[in-house]
């Protein structure tokens, strides 16, 4: 009576949050590049010569993102004017970030809801 032991290996993704954090970090440190020719070879070099050359692990981009603050139908951007924001948030839904430094108006709204309260 012989027994066999099998080992099975497979690749697995790290937790989604960890992947997101790494991508966000890379996005925040992305370098704007332009195409240049060295001899007959085309290479990507930083648009700003004060930045260090990128590595194969870095994110790079050729074109800047549109300004999402202002209305620009050509690029499909609706802008942020008139949107509702969270006055206390420092995240993307916060008024400081969403209103792009234009300032914002604060409205106090009272919401009345029916509930099944028992006293």
Curated annotation (Swiss-Prot):
Pfam families: wnt. Disulfide bonds join 69-100, 85-95. One of its GO terms (biological process) is cell fate commitment. Glycans are attached at residue 86. InterPro entries: Wnt (IPR005817), Wnt_C (IPR043158). Palmitoleoylation is required for efficient binding to frizzled receptors. Depalmitoleoylation leads to Wnt signaling pathway inhibition. GO terms for cellular component: extracellular space. A lipid is attached at residue 1 (O-palmitoleoyl serine). Keywords: Developmental protein, Disulfide bond, Extracellular matrix, Glycoprotein, Lipoprotein, Secreted, Wnt signaling pathway. Gene3D superfamilies: 3.30.2460.20. Ligand for members of the frizzled family of seven transmembrane receptors. Plays an important role in embryonic development. PANTHER family: PROTEIN WNT-4, WNT RELATED. This is Protein Wnt-4. The lineage of its organism: Eukaryota, Metazoa, Chordata, Craniata, Vertebrata.
